[in-house]
Regions:
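Gly/Ser/Thr-enriched, mixed-charge loops and adjacent short helices
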Residues: 1-107
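Solvent-exposed alpha-helices and their adjacent loops that cap or buttress functional pockets
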Residues: 39-45, 102-107, 116, 124, ...
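Proline/glycine-rich low-complexity loops and linkers
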Residues: 2-33, 37-39, 128-177
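Short gly/pro/ser/thr-enriched loop/turn and capping motifs at secondary-structure boundaries
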Residues: 80-84, 121, 139-140, 162
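Short acidic, glycine/serine/threonine-rich loops at helix termini
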Residues: 60-64, 85-88, 122-127, 164-170
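Gly/Ser/Thr-rich loops at beta-strand to alpha-helix junctions
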Residues: 55-59, 119-120, 160-162
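Glycine-rich phosphate-binding loop
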Residues: 104-126, 131, 173-177
Length: 177
């Protein structure tokens, strides 16, 4: 990257002799199959779940997976809109949790899930609308993965250490920051 930066700063970019191409692939079916591969759908209970997509990328995947699970989804800020008319889609910020909490209370949902705008992080709320800190979720996931694959490696955010490290040790796994 430093070399690219140097070339750009010195205007030393040489034209290429052959241009690349762009292709569009529908990766959603493979992604959904991957997600469902972690779940025994036959053992799932009917739940009412608030899903706050934050007007970001989560909505289309929620729509696609909806018929494959025995859940009722209460959709909040569901339509993708890059102008984010309902505010910054970051449920980690306390000030952005209100719509999810309100939907849990008004619908009697069993839990809530809110995603960030680019759909790479999700955050959970209990049936009372209380935010569940990420280290508890990472711990539950680590335990589940290590029960399925003892001695496995758990890659985690360095901000979420204590619980993950303890669980990895308990299940003979390796916590990697």
């Amino acid at each position: 990257l430093k070399e690219i930066k140097r070339l750009a700063e010195n205007n030393e970019i040489t034209p290429c002799s052959e241009y690349g191409s762009i292709s569009f692939e529908d990766t959603q079916p493979a992604y959904i199959a991957h997600l469902l591969g972690y779940v025994d759908r036959e053992s799932l209970s009917k739940l009412k779940i608030v899903c706050n997509a934050g007007n970001g990328g989560a909505g289309p995947t929620i729509n696609a997976i909806e018929q494959m699970l025995p859940f009722e989804f209460i959709k909040v800020h569901h339509e993708a809109d890059g102008t984010f008319p309902n505010g910054v889609p970051n449920p980690l910020l306390v000030e952005n949790r209100g719509p999810t909490i309100e939907a849990i209370h008004s619908s009697g949902a069993d839990l809530g899930i809110a995603w960030d705008g680019d759909f790479d992080r999700c955050f959970f709320f209990d049936e009372n609308g209380r935010f569940i800190e990420g280290y508890y979720i990472v711990g539950l996931l680590a335990q589940s993965f290590l029960e399925a694959e003892p001695g496995g490696k758990i890659v985690h955010d360095p901000r979420l250490t204590w619980n993950t490290i303890e669980i990895a040790q308990e299940f003979s796994g390796q916590a990697i920051q």
